[in-house]
Amino acid sequence: MTRKHIEVVAAIIQKGNAILATQRGYGDLKDGWEFPGGKVEPGEAHDEALIREIKEELQADINVGERLITVNYNGYEKFDLTMHCYMCTLTEDSHVTLLEHEAAKWLTKESLYSVDWLPADIEAVDALYKHL
């Protein structure tokens, strides 16, 4: 039997020297911390998917920058994951409103590992730590 494969994009939203982490409020991975984002729809470019997902989840508008890392993670029980992580910033007048997450924190480089990141996000956190 072929395992389900999901392709997602994640926004590493930077504001000053802080990065946004969000805590999932739903599903099997509830309560884990992640970079916000979601599934890429068929025919959708990564930047389009990021802009759409962040608007849906956080009611925020973002500028999508460089791709930091693509993570291939096969450790979840029900699916394999490819996650494309992009450096992003909020647009000038935008702010974050939690619609799907339980909580959010702005983390500095020093506090990046202070939350319980979901397993698939850890490789991206490690890459981000080196990047900052």
Feature roles, as predicted:
Residues D61, V71-H95, K105, K109:
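Active-site-adjacent beta-strand/loop module that shapes the phosphate/pyrophosphate-binding cleft
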Residues F35-L68, T108:
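The catalytic Nudix box helix
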Residues R3, A11, G25, G32, ...:
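Short secondary-structure boundary/capping segments
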Residues V40-A45, A49, E77, L99-E102, ...:
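Residues at secondary-structure transition points
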Residues M1-I19, K39:
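Conserved N-terminal beta-strand and adjoining loop/helix that marks the start
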